[in-house]
Amino acid sequence: VKRISFLALALLAVAQVSSAATCTSGTLASYLALGSGGCTIGNDVLSNFQTLSGQTGATEIATNAVFVTPGGGTSTPSLTFSTSQTVSTGYLVESIFTYQLSGSSITSASLALSNSSEQVDGAVTDIENFCAGGIFGPDGVDGCTGTAGSLLTLDGTQNSDASPLGPASFASITNDFTVDGGTAGSAAGGIFANSFTAMPEPASLFMAAIGILIATTARIYSKRKA
């Protein structure tokens, strides 16, 4: 009876950990719709996706025109965002949004920009601001209640950036992606990827051990019945 009670409690705990849906490919619009429940990559939860007010004069990129592809696992969660935008002289388009990452102890963040081009003084950029162990103020950039940091990419000049983060089991992330035609040029883009390095929390390791114990006990019990 004790064994059955233990297994029941363990199964309940596993069910609670896995209650959020697994992150799948979609659009920024579909990720916004996830709300506070979010989705999971391994044991990490990504949630509370929200768009923010952009630069004066910029045209917002439609959220259903930004595609999201999750990757990695518990120790290497990542999100790749892609869109196809082309602008000419005097035009600027922007996608600025924030989200939260929690679960494992996050130790570093990296940003990569690709599939972009520019002519004359056009530019494609992505700035990633992060708040380790806290949240941003209403603008998604300032007022970090934890430890703030930022990553910068400018196509053709610096296409990747990385920084230590935390360690923290919770972080707020804001991306500000722009395609700017400049005053005499043009630009097109692009793909930008947020990647993180994380260490499983003791609770995650405990749940993994519980899962192994359940499977082992079930096999032993089946053999004894046979």
Task: Indicate residue ranges for each PLM-predicted region.
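A short, hydrophobic C-terminal helix/tail in secreted or cell-surface proteins
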Residues: 201-219
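A detector of low-complexity, intrinsically disordered, Ser/Thr/Gly/Pro/Ala-rich segments
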Residues: 2, 20-22, 215
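Positively charged n-region of N-terminal signal peptides that target proteins for export
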Residues: 1-4, 223-225
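Single, functionally critical "micro-switch" positions that shape active/binding sites
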Residues: 200, 226
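N-terminal signal peptide c-region/cleavage motif recognized by signal peptidases
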Residues: 15-17
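Helix-boundary and membrane-interface capping/anchor signal
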Residues: 21-198
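Sec-dependent N-terminal signal peptides
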Residues: 4-13, 208-211
